[in-house]
Amino acid sequence: MKILCITIGLYFALLPALAQADFRSLEALAAPSADPWSYWQTSDESNVRTIDFSVWGNILRRFVAPSQYGINLFKYADVAANDRAAIDGLVSSLAALPIRSYNRAQQMAYWINLYNVLTVKVVLDNGPVKTIRDIDISPGFFSDGPWGKKLLKIEGQGVTLNDIEHRILRPFWKDPRIHYALNCASLGCPNLGTRAYEASNLDEQLDIAAYTFINHPRGARLENGEMIVSSIYDWFTLDFGGDEAGVIAHLRKYAGPDLIAALDKHGRLDRAEYNWNLNGSF
């Protein structure tokens, strides 16, 4: 009873702050923060070696299919045993790399591709499922999904999906476009692309990913007098300028003419939403 009273008291204590947070939700309070894992901050900018992502690129070309709704779907049901073996082999080869000895551009491409490979692998290994959130392999009584599970070891360190996103990519690169590159196997997530990310043209690829998502209805849209945005901007507002005005400025940077006009006319964000249904079927 005491714990329940404290929880209810905390909820009501937070109401004034939430009211000032515009479109932000209670769910945003539980979103992981950028918490740097200093071990992975090391790089060697003199190293010109490149990482081969051709196996992943081949998987993407064969199994990612654009839908009529502008959302890329993954053909999980079509992945044969030899394809799964190729994915497993790719994960093993990426895990064996001394990634801290590479330059930062190679590292960024590495972590993005590894995150997406692992996400596909974890769905294949635990499917069929209707949503990735049903893959309850993370430790902790209140945890759901696979994000807290140590999925592999890199340079002797156990690494989770949460580590890659929130302890490596977000804190060390501080680039909001990262959110458009990482795919969480859900319809509400930015598209899983048909090409692997490459250090040689990362900026172009990230810009395209940002433009594609923001100008799709699941990124931002004006509907029935409401400006509805992806929950990504609710959960990670700090990455997009820190407040509602910052999110709007970020959206305008990549928005097409119609969305810019809608943002300028409406002037605010009303609510956020997200579709956790799986981005494909078995």
Predicted regions and their residues:
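Sec/Tat signal peptide C-region and signal peptidase I cleavage site
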Residues: 17-20
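Bacterial N-terminal signal peptides
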Residues: 5-15
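Interaction/scaffold regions that mediate signaling and macromolecular assembly across diverse proteins
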Residues: 22-112, 116-282
